[in-house]
Design a protein with these regions (language model features):
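Sec-dependent bacterial lipoprotein signal peptides
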Residues: 1-13
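Long luminal/extracellular ectodomains of secretory-pathway precursor proteins
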Residues: 15-52, 59-261
Length: 261
């Protein structure tokens, strides 16, 4: 035990502790030039974890949070943020430790902070002493690398199924089509596109899955017939609403609507 502790102290002397056993570092911006860091990114260095974060257009993402989860010691993760070139580097030469690396990016948009998970190019664990390169991409949509849902957000609705014009027939969620028109750039600064999709039912209810975070004007129809719409439990019904996303969990966001004939 004494030997292991001594090795840990020697290896991690350049890190600081943040809240208990969590250790933090900073992106290596002082020892080498940007060109030198770029030239070295493609080669694995023993005892070093490094990589780069870019967005879907290939632009560097500064300020992304990279976490190397120490699978040997509880609550002793290594944490670093990316520099202006989207690059990061930290020592991973921890005795007998294996790490799995994840990342998030937090951005303010329309007055709210959103934290979104990054897509790893390689999510296999690695031995800290061996070192590794772990790059990430910030994607607004697409299936998650772990298969647990999507990177995009949810647009959910509650449909009043009773139709006063046809009391003997109940409206079906799956027959609803939503149209989302972006009201400006998306959260990553890219231009959004008009989304027109038929509803599907997910674990959180009927609606649209995997929608890029932005602010949208939303309309709804049922088999071609326009529906009245409002933000759930808010305001009067109308022909359209303009809405942004609210948090469902730490990294999952949603818009909730109410629809009626």
């Amino acid at each position: 035990v004494i030997v292991v502790i001594g090795v840990l102290i020697a290896v991690l002397s350049g890190c600081t502790f943040e809240g208990g056993d969590r250790m933090t570092g900073t992106a290596d911006a002082g020892r080498e030039t940007t060109a030198e860091r770029q030239a070295g990114t493609g080669q694995v260095e023993a005892g070093v974890l490094k990589g780069q974060v870019v967005d879907a257009a290939g632009r560097p993402v500064a300020g992304a949070k990279i976490v190397a989860d120490n699978q040997l010691l509880y609550d002793s993760n290594l944490v670093v943020t990316t520099d202006e070139d989207g690059r990061y580097q930290m020592s991973s030469d921890v005795a007998a430790a294996t790490f799995r690396v994840t990342g998030t990016v937090t951005r303010r948009f329309e007055g709210r902070a959103y934290t979104m998970e990054l897509t790893p190019h390689d999510d296999t664990p690695f031995v800290g002493a061996d070192g590794a390169i772990r790059d990430f991409t910030w994607r607004l949509t697409g299936e998650r690398s772990d298969g647990l849902g999507f990177y995009g957000a949810l647009v959910l609705f509650y449909l009043e199924s009773y139709d006063p014009q046809n009391p003997d027939t109940f409206l079906q969620d799956e027959d609803v089509t939503l149209t989302l028109t972006p009201q400006g750039p998306l959260i990553d600064g890219s231009a959004g596109e008009v989304i027109t999709r038929r509803a599907e039912r997910g674990g959180d209810g009927p609606g649209l899955l995997d929608v890029p975070i932005g602010r949208y004007r939303i309309t709804a129809e049922h088999l071609g017939r326009p529906l009245k719409i409002r933000i759930r439990d808010t305001g009067e019904y109308g022909e359209a609403v303009v809405a942004g996303f609210e948090p469902l969990t730490t990294t999952v966001y949603r818009i909730q609507l109410e629809l009626k004939p």
